[in-house]
Amino acid sequence: MTWRLQWGNTSYDGPRPTKSKSLLINMESLLLYNLYPKNNWKDVTRTILLNVPFHNSIIVNVTLDKFDYYLKRHKYIERYLKKKYKKIDKIVYSLNDKKLGEVVGFNKLREAIDYDRFDIVTYTHSKGVTKPKNNNIQDWVKMMTYFLIERHDLCLRSFDEGYVLYGTQLSKYNYDRVRQRTYKYCDYWYAGTFVSVNIKKIKKEFISTNCPENYYGVEAFFGNLSPVDIAYCAHKSPFPLYKLPYPKENYLIDE
């Protein structure tokens, strides 16, 4: 039975999310990593890319400051990444624009995807490299890595149930809050912006949806891909993760 959702000028026709025990084990999964190589970037990269058991391939965007590009630092970074992380099949580059945050690199990554091959795309980024002394952010990255990479089976399960997005820390917007007006009015967001997308279901939306050109553009992008009803939240902390530690005991699942 087809389930129809309408949001704005876009609609979704597909199965209603239901509980199912079968997994889409034949789906090809791609991991995207948006890297800004500053401060503790090697540690953050190790946290995210060291253990990638389920994704078939990795594409990395390296965002460079003009001075780093002039010094050809990207050549060293590329050699380092390919030596350490064998699943990396492609590395692309972008120049840093502080006003746009992750947007330029994210669009580069979207352009680099073979959409005929992959059914699932997982987006990650080097969160915390501009605040290397904040251990709480490092805890946050470990939590997102656990759910988005190490427990990719949970993503497969949610997609098998009819969801098209998967992540953590999902919140709906309160448009009365001034800061959130800069997100250009999407209905919800995944704080931290580690998100998996069911390309098999919403490839057209993923390719054609505009990524707003502001610092929070990537966060808004995912919130414009589908209704919140088919966006899955694997875990949500009871408090903001910038301010307090979040050890793994708070979220590890025994199965």
What is each model feature region?
Residues 1-255:
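ER/Golgi luminal nucleotide-sugar-dependent glycosyltransferases, focusing on the catalytic module
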